[in-house]
Amino acid sequence: MKKALLVVSFGTSYHDTCEKNIVACERDLAASCPDRDLFRAFTSGMIIRKLRQRDGIDIDTPLQALQKLAAQGYQDVAIQSLHIINGDEYEKIVREVQLLRPLFTRLTLGVPLLSSHNDYVQLMQALRQQMPSLRQTEKVVFMGHGASHHAFAAYACLDHMMTAQRFPARVGAVESYPEVDILIDSLRDEGVTGVHLMPLMLVAGDHAINDMASDDGDSWKMRFNAAGIPATPWLSGLGENPAIRAMFVAHLHQALNMAVEEAA
């Protein structure tokens, strides 16, 4: 039976960032199941259109990729999401998998990065590996994307766990709670004298470059600076962290093992 591995991410239009993060994840996932042929899909229609119009590069949606795999005779397909939370983008994959499940003998789906309590614990350990050495009055602030979906609560949960465990970092979100102003007020009250800004995103794309690290007056860097807390931005996506890539590999194999147990 022909076997495939389909790695699905939101996507990025930055080629170097894609190589450092998405390709790095794909490489580790593919190495963990060498009997499968590797394929890629993006969930962002906007990024797919931009790559097609700007670069002439065609990337499939998950639905298109699965339809092509079925047409090519793949009957055992393992999908791994590279999303951070179980939000709208991941639910899009779930719906498309359910729709096309009858076309395959076996179709598995590995969950996003933050899907269980243990994932939060492991993520904090993984983040520690990429954090710079800090003075006593410094902290790292991680920028999450945020969401209108109820899964936005994952960012507040991670932030709460960090605070409760005296982990030297906080988490905010660009498009939902916790807003950066809340973090600025809280850190100022704590007497924090400097922060390091890092993306809590698979890739360091538009949000990290413009909303986090730019000299624009509304960027997180400038807002911390204006509040008297010097901010140093770091432009590296989570996909560059080997420990985080290992979490995605573990999720892939959890889904595959569960499918074996259910079939037994």
From Swiss-Prot:
<comment type="function">
    <text>Cobalt chelatase responsible for the insertion of cobalt during anaerobic cobalamin biosynthesis. Can catalyze the insertion of Co(2+) into either sirohydrochlorin or precorrin-2. It is not clear which is the natural substrate in Salmonella.</text>
</comment>
<dbReference type="GO" id="GO:0016852">
    <property type="term" value="F:sirohydrochlorin cobaltochelatase activity"/>
</dbReference>
<feature type="binding site">
    <location>
        <position position="207"/>
    </location>
    <ligand>
        <name>Co(2+)</name>
    </ligand>
</feature>
<dbReference type="GO" id="GO:0006779">
    <property type="term" value="P:porphyrin-containing compound biosynthetic process"/>
</dbReference>
<feature type="binding site">
    <location>
        <position position="202"/>
    </location>
    <ligand>
        <name>Co-sirohydrochlorin</name>
    </ligand>
</feature>
<feature type="binding site">
    <location>
        <position position="175"/>
    </location>
    <ligand>
        <name>Co(2+)</name>
    </ligand>
</feature>
<feature type="binding site">
    <location>
        <position position="88"/>
    </location>
    <ligand>
        <name>Co-sirohydrochlorin</name>
    </ligand>
</feature>
<feature type="binding site">
    <location>
        <position position="207"/>
    </location>
    <ligand>
        <name>Co-sirohydrochlorin</name>
    </ligand>
</feature>
<dbReference type="InterPro" id="IPR010388">
    <property type="entry name" value="Anaerobic_Co-chelatase"/>
</dbReference>
<keyword id="KW-0169">Cobalamin biosynthesis</keyword>
<feature type="binding site">
    <location>
        <position position="85"/>
    </location>
    <ligand>
        <name>Co-sirohydrochlorin</name>
    </ligand>
</feature>
<dbReference type="GO" id="GO:0019251">
    <property type="term" value="P:anaerobic cobalamin biosynthetic process"/>
</dbReference>
<feature type="binding site">
    <location>
        <position position="145"/>
    </location>
    <ligand>
        <name>Co(2+)</name>
    </ligand>
</feature>
<dbReference type="GO" id="GO:0046906">
    <property type="term" value="F:tetrapyrrole binding"/>
</dbReference>
<dbReference type="GO" id="GO:0050897">
    <property type="term" value="F:cobalt ion binding"/>
</dbReference>
<keyword id="KW-0456">Lyase</keyword>
<feature type="active site" description="Proton acceptor">
    <location>
        <position position="145"/>
    </location>
</feature>
<comment type="pathway">
    <text>Cofactor biosynthesis; adenosylcobalamin biosynthesis; cob(II)yrinate a,c-diamide from sirohydrochlorin (anaerobic route): step 1/10.</text>
</comment>
<keyword id="KW-0479">Metal-binding</keyword>
<feature type="binding site">
    <location>
        <position position="203"/>
    </location>
    <ligand>
        <name>Co-sirohydrochlorin</name>
    </ligand>
</feature>
<comment type="similarity">
    <text>Belongs to the CbiK family.</text>
</comment>
<feature type="binding site">
    <location>
        <position position="89"/>
    </location>
    <ligand>
        <name>Co-sirohydrochlorin</name>
    </ligand>
</feature>
<dbReference type="Pfam" id="PF06180">
    <property type="entry name" value="CbiK"/>
</dbReference>
<comment type="subunit">
    <text>Homotrimer.</text>
</comment>
<feature type="binding site">
    <location>
        <position position="45"/>
    </location>
    <ligand>
        <name>Co-sirohydrochlorin</name>
    </ligand>
</feature>
<protein>
    <recommendedName>
        <fullName>Sirohydrochlorin cobaltochelatase</fullName>
        <ecNumber>4.99.1.3</ecNumber>
    </recommendedName>
</protein>
<keyword id="KW-0170">Cobalt</keyword>
<keyword id="KW-0627">Porphyrin biosynthesis</keyword>
<feature type="binding site">
    <location>
        <position position="84"/>
    </location>
    <ligand>
        <name>Co-sirohydrochlorin</name>
    </ligand>
</feature>
<feature type="binding site">
    <location>
        <position position="92"/>
    </location>
    <ligand>
        <name>Co-sirohydrochlorin</name>
    </ligand>
</feature>
